[in-house]
Curated annotation (Swiss-Prot):
This is Putative lysine N-acyltransferase C17G9.06c. GO terms for biological process: siderophore biosynthetic process. It comes from Schizosaccharomyces pombe (strain 972 / ATCC 24843). The keyword Nucleus applies. GO terms for molecular function: N-acyltransferase activity. Its EC number is 2.3.1.-. The active site is at E286. It is an enzyme of class 2 (transferase). Keywords: Acyltransferase, Cytoplasm, Nucleus, Transferase. Belongs to the lysine N-acyltransferase mbtK family. It is found in: Cytoplasm; Nucleus. One of its GO terms (cellular component) is nucleus. Substrate binds at H248. Pfam families: Acetyltransf_8 (PF13523).
Length: 334
């Protein structure tokens, strides 16, 4: 097994010669992870990492192990001789065992760490269930800003989500909405001016915003992200939770269609929404009931079809995934 894995700043070639030995190399840097069956720990051996932060080193090591073992359900324990001298700068949310001199985390917790994938500041408001509480939302992101970025080893490409900027992205929205296969489900074909007005209205709506998906910086998809309580799906989502999220999706660039890509971007947009606000416990969708291909993709990514219901303009499937389901199953596809 051999593929590329990125730290926050550098690409490393990962080689797994056997299940108990993982090697990461980049220029003069070399990281060796060796599994010790007797202690159930991974030993870290470093060379050339003097200029890399301890948190970045540990995250790279954990990431590599979870790439090689994507369904691992046990705690991963890293044994590193230098960890005691570095503990003062340790900010990664991992368990530090001072007595044993090791750090540990499980896969479910690891994928809920926002950095390095989230580029925008995540909400840090605490979860509250008080009656008549003021609903506090993160502000909509600045148009054109990168929200999420992650290297995908299976594709050898970088996936990113960018907040829609009308001047920069209107051309893609206009082209994609006028494709017959998109118009069939979205019903938003129209002129340049009509689409400009549509996106301007969206930009002024505090409950929703547009997102452009890119592979290697090439736009391929459009998403609309929304808060469920303020959306038209709310009456059907009872009992809805204050911080439920949802999204609409279309893949407009035909070069980036295919069953090998859908699980990647579908799990990644879900990942982004759960990371964006730790109070979010559910992500919901309402695809048209005859969009069976997309519904099946959602089910394959551990979404549940809860019911069918009628909007004025369509019959829809109510699709749901909880935070626990997402992170306890696979998390984002790699």
């Amino acid at each position: 097994m051999s593929f590329t894995v990125w730290s926050k700043t550098e690409p490393f070639k990962l080689s797994a010669v056997q299940e108990s030995l993982i090697t990461l190399e980049h220029d003069n840097k070399r990281l060796l992870l060796t599994y010790r069956e007797e202690s159930k720990t991974w030993d870290i051996d470093l060379n050339g990492f003097q200029d890399m932060d301890v948190n970045e080193i540990l995250q790279l090591a954990f990431l590599s192990i979870f790439y090689v073992f994507p369904t691992l359900r046990t705690e991963v324990v890293l044994q590193w001789a230098n960890i005691e001298s570095q503990k003062g700068t340790l900010s990664l949310p991992v368990e530090y065992n001072e007595l044993e001199g090791n750090v540990s985390i499980d896969r479910m917790s690891f994928w809920q760490i926002p950095s390095p994938w989230m580029y925008t500041r995540c909400s840090d408001w605490p979860l509250s269930y008080l009656p008549n509480q003021v609903i506090r939302r993160p502000k909509c992101p600045k148009p054109g800003s990168t929200l999420y970025e992650r290297f995908i080893p299976s594709l050898n490409e970088t996936l990113s989500f960018v907040s829609l900027d009308i001047e920069q992205h209107l051309q893609y929205f206009h082209e994609w909405q006028n494709k017959p296969r998109v118009e069939y489900f979205w019903n938003e074909s129209g002129s340049w001016d009509q689409h400009h007005e549509y996106l301007t209205t969206l930009q002024n709506d505090p409950h929703s915003f547009g997102v452009i998906g890119c592979f290697n910086d090439v736009p391929f998809a459009y998403f609309e992200v929304y808060w469920v309580p303020e959306d038209r799906i709310a009456p059907f989502a009872q009992p809805w939770h204050t911080h439920d999220r949802g999204f609409h999706a279309l893949v407009g660039n035909d070069k980036f269609r295919g069953p090998h890509r859908v699980p990647v971007w579908l799990s990644s947009i879900t990942h982004m929404l759960f990371l964006d606000d730790p109070r979010t416990q559910r992500v919901l969708l309402e695809p048209r009931i005859d969009n069976s291909k997309f519904i099946n993709y959602l089910i394959e990514e551990n979404y549940s079809k809860r019911l069918e219901f009628n909007f004025p303009h369509k019959r829809a499937a109510f699709m749901e995934i909880t935070r626990n389901m997402f992170f306890s199953c696979l998390g984002p596809r790699i």
